[in-house]
């Protein structure tokens, strides 16, 4: 019996939480700003 792994899809992930998706909305831009302020190595996925 094969196991179902919850892999996820790259395209879906990029489209919902990628950099350009974040920059599209004001609140998303705030997320990027907050992560920059905090000094995160990775801003988005």
From Swiss-Prot:
Domain of life of the native organism: Bacteria
One protein family per Pfam: Ribosomal_L34
Protein's organism: Thermosynechococcus vestitus (strain NIES-2133 / IAM M-273 / BP-1)
A biological process term (GO) from this entry: translation
Keywords attached to this entry: Ribonucleoprotein, Ribosomal protein
Entries under InterPro entries matching the protein: Ribosomal_bL34, Ribosomal_bL34_CS
Family note: Belongs to the bacterial ribosomal protein bL34 family.
GO cellular component, as recorded: ribonucleoprotein complex; ribosome
Compositionally biased region (Basic residues): 33-45
Protein name (database record): Large ribosomal subunit protein bL34
Molecular function (Gene Ontology), one example: structural constituent of ribosome
